[in-house]
């Protein structure tokens, strides 16, 4: 007997499952009876934000998802884009925020495991990873523990699995004190004629369980990921999954071998809501029913209930619909890799989701209403209140610009991330061309191919809070610029939208306007969103995180030998600014970090100018005019120049244009701007090309000496810059 299904369904139990009273009434109307305890858990898992996107789906539909290179957009395990020669890139970014705060090592590790499965489920071998991490104030007592655990968890899983980490972000702000963000990105390469989908087809076909055994870890994980935190965090620790990267590696190899056999009809990884979600999604997408027998599920713990088996989020598991004539050969492959292969059910034609356990039917529900017809809300929202423009003349000028620059370089958010990325294997697989620490990571498509892929992920949360619309646009354009600085053509993006409680109209307004900004930018730049993730309820005791819509993008280089980096400049190169001189100090780190001014609107994003300047930069890189390129973002011109000096270990001498106040020209964060180190013989050709294309270009100076010398108002040696840039993170992590 399933004793768990004898549990009385009370209002308290319904609330514990995160279901509103109107949602429960909808369930009663839908099935015409009271649900069993297991069914209640299934509805709770499938109708929460993490699985259903019920608060955001209306707005996600406005994103541009089509493009000339797009093979598969949102709705599958990951997005797919064509890169030519019969190959495609499969990629996605996904959050594991709540679990990583509760149990940082396992939360981050299993976040990596989940996104890796999303990619190789579709037939792609993972080739690159990134992560975007947001932590609380460095002064908060938990921050150092969380940083250490998350970084170790990501490295422990991705290094053992064998995928290089090529880029990412790490930022600190007190608004993440109670809710850190762990956004993980993975890209893989597949054959365009061998992509595997999750849509079940055919009646009476075997449904097969693949991979590791099912335990009690992660039960209720999807529900936990859709709730606010309070002071009872430790009680949620059992909802965090435990991962094993070595089993995942075996699962990858077994799945790819099985795919070569052409035995798979549909395949889905078991992620949020585990077996429930994978079975329901496969059936609902294919307009088929699914029948499961839980007695056939491999379990690693005794006396597991139907509720626990259905909602476990144990890692390294897949569900597949198999061609029956190939089941013996398929089973042999998984046996060879030491993994479980168990036929646990079949597809049906009745659009019902039926589950039996110990001879008893414990679930009998309509599958479409559970899956792709789950409730969708049009939540009330209010338009964000915008800050007035802050003129540079209104911002105090600090006389010692050298001290300002050194303070920024030695700050939590502008210092080197070497301490982080040196814990990741950045070179495994042998195709990494540009490692973390620059604008974008770059890998070769393969060791005998001239093509390369570039990756970047970006967002500026302080911009998004001041103006979610402009902040959403800026997240896209910075990612697009970073890819462009390598010479790669940006092809497509994935989003990871991290926000607070959508039931708060102010928070919902942030989400709505950020999506509007992202949509407009992606449309103008031909940079479609092909996959993504929404993480809501990132609040603790009513304190919401900064709105953080992370954008990760992929670009393509036809010839990797033409790749340029932030640190490639040579002596006697000309330093050239593409775009306007700095003037905008609103929401700049100069205003916030140096003057403690949280005022002004963020910089306006001119999308046509972004497109024009990005195309020009890629063109001059392809023509071989440029030794180094860097986009200008946080910290403006001064910080960008300092980073180039540090990476190249070469000095720069420049003069300011004096078109703006000096502090604005140095630290203004105007957009659509790049610094290029131009080869001496190519300078005139580049200037002529800029004139023909009506590109704003300013000659600033040259690569020379052993210091960063700006108009004699700032003169800092390479050693001094490097020491300040590299010292903050190790000192922070080694504090006793």
From Swiss-Prot:
Belongs to the FGAMS family. Mg(2+) 1 binds at residues 94, 533. The keyword Flavoprotein does not apply. It is found in: Cytoplasm. The keyword Magnesium applies. This is Phosphoribosylformylglycinamidine synthase subunit PurL. ATP binds at residues 53, 92, 495, 532. It catalyses: N(2)-formyl-N(1)-(5-phospho-beta-D-ribosyl)glycinamide + L-glutamine + ATP + H2O = 2-formamido-N(1)-(5-O-phospho-beta-D-ribosyl)acetamidine + L-glutamate + ADP + phosphate + H(+). Pfam families: AIRS, AIRS_C, FGAR-AT_linker. Its EC number is 6.3.5.3. Mg(2+) 2 binds at residues 118, 269. HAMAP family: PurL_2 (MF_00420). Signal peptide: none annotated. The active site is at 50, 96 (proton acceptor). One of its GO terms (biological process) is 'de novo' IMP biosynthetic process. The gene is purL. Monomer. Part of the FGAM synthase complex composed of 1 PurL, 1 PurQ and 2 PurS subunits. Substrate binds at residues 95-98, 117, 241, 313-315, 535. SUPFAM superfamilies: PurM C-terminal domain-like (SSF56042), PurM N-terminal domain-like (SSF55326). One of its GO terms (molecular function) is ATP binding. It comes from the Bacteria. CDD domains: PurL_repeat1, PurL_repeat2. Its main location: cytoplasm. Part of the phosphoribosylformylglycinamidine synthase complex involved in the purines biosynthetic pathway. Catalyzes the ATP-dependent conversion of formylglycinamide ribonucleotide (FGAR) and glutamine to yield formylglycinamidine ribonucleotide (FGAM) and glutamate. The FGAM synthase complex is composed of three subunits. PurQ produces an ammonia molecule by converting glutamine to glutamate. PurL transfers the ammonia molecule to FGAR to form FGAM in an ATP-dependent manner. InterPro entries: PRibForGlyAmidine_synth_PurL, PurL_linker, PurM-like_C_dom, PurM-like_C_sf, PurM-like_N, PurM-like_N_sf. Keywords: ATP-binding, Cytoplasm, Ligase, Magnesium, Metal-binding, Nucleotide-binding, Purine biosynthesis.
């Amino acid at each position: 007997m399933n004793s768990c299904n004898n549990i009385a369904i009370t209002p308290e139990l319904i609330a514990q499952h995160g279901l509103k009273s109107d949602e429960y009434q909808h369930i009663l109307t839908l099935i015409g009876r009271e649900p069993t305890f297991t069914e209640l858990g299934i509805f709770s898992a499938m109708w929460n934000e993490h699985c259903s996107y019920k608060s955001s789906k209306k707005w996600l539909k406005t994103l541009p998802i089509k493009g000339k290179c797009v093979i598969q957009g949102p709705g599958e395990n990951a997005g797919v884009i064509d890169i030519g020669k019969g190959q495609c890139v499969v990629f996605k970014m996904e959050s594991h925020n709540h679990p990583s705060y509760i149990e940082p090592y396992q939360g981050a590790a299993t976040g990596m495991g989940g996104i890796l499965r999303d990619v190789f489920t579709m037939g792609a071998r993972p080739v690159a990873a990134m992560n975007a991490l947001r932590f609380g104030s460095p002064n908060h007592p938990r921050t150092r523990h969380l940083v250490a655990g998350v970084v170790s968890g990501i490295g422990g899983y991705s290094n053992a699995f064998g995928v290089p980490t090529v880029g990412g972000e790490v930022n600190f702000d007190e608004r993440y004190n109670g809710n850190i963000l762990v956004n993980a990105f993975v890209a893989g390469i597949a054959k365009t004629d061998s992509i595997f989908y999750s849509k079940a087809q055919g009646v009476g076909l075997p449904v097969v369980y693949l991979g590791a055994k099912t335990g009690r870890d992660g039960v209720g994980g999807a529900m936990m990921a859709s709730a606010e935190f309070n002071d009872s965090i430790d009680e949620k620790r059992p909802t965090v999954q435990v991962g094993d990267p070595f089993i995942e590696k075996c699962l990858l190899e077994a799945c790819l071998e099985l795919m070569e056999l052409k035995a798979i009809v549909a395949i889905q990884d078991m992620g949020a809501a585990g077996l429930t979600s994978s079975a329901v999604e496969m059936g609902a997408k294919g307009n088929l029913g699914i029948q499961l027998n839980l007695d056939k599920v491999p379990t690693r713990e005794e006396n597991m209930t139907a509720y626990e088996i259905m909602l476990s989020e144990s890692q390294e598991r897949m569900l597949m619909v198999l061609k029956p004539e190939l089941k013996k050969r398929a089973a042999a492959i998984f046996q060879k890799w030491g993994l479980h292969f168990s036929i646990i059910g079949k597809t049906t034609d009745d659009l019902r989701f039926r589950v039996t356990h110990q001879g008893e039917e414990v679930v009998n529900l309509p599958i479409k209403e559970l899956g792709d017809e789950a409730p969708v809300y049009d939540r009330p929202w209010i338009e964000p209140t915008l800050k007035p423009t802050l003129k540079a003349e209104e911002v105090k000028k600090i006389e010692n610009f050298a001290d300002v620059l050194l303070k920024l370089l030695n700050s939590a958010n502008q210092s080197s991330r070497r301490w982080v990325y040196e814990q990741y294997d950045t070179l495994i697989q042998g195709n990494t061309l540009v490692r973390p620490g620059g604008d974008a990571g770059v890998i070769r498509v393969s060791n005998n191919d001239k093509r390369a892929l570039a990756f970047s992920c970006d967002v500026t949360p302080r911009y998004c809070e001041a103006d979610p619309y402009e902040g959403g646009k800026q997240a896209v354009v910075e990612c697009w610029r970073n890819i462009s600085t390598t010479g790669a053509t940006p092809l497509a993006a994935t989003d990871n939208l991290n926000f607070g409680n959508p039931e708060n109209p102010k928070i919902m307004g942030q989400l709505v306007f950020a999506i509007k900004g992202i949509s407009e930018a992606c449309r103008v730049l031909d940079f479609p969103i092909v996959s993504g993730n929404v993480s809501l309820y990132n609040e603790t005791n009513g304190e919401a995180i900064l709105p953080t819509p992370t954008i990760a993008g992929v670009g393509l280089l036809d010839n990797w030998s033409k790749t340029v980096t932030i640190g490639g400049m040579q002596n006697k190169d000309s330093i050239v600014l593409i775009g306007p001189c700095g003037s905008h100090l609103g929401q700049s780190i100069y205003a916030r970090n140096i003057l403690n001014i949280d005022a002004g609107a963020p910089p306006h994003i001119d999308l046509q100018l972004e497109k024009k300047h990005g195309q020009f930069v890629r063109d001059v890189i392809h023509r071989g005019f440029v030794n180094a390129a860097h986009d200008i973002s946080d910290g403006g011109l001064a910080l960008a120049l300092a980073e180039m000096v540090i990476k190249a270990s070469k000095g720069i001498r420049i003069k300011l244009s004096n078109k703006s106040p000096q502090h604005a020209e140095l630290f203004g964060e105007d957009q659509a701007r790049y610094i290029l180190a131009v080869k001496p013989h190519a300078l005139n050709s580049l200037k002529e090309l800029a004139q023909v294309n009506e590109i704003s270009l300013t000659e600033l100076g040259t690569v020379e000496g052993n210091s960063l010398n700006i108009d004699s108002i700032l003169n800092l040696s390479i050693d001094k810059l490097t020491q300040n840039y590299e010292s903050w993170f190790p000192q922070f992590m080694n504090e006793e």
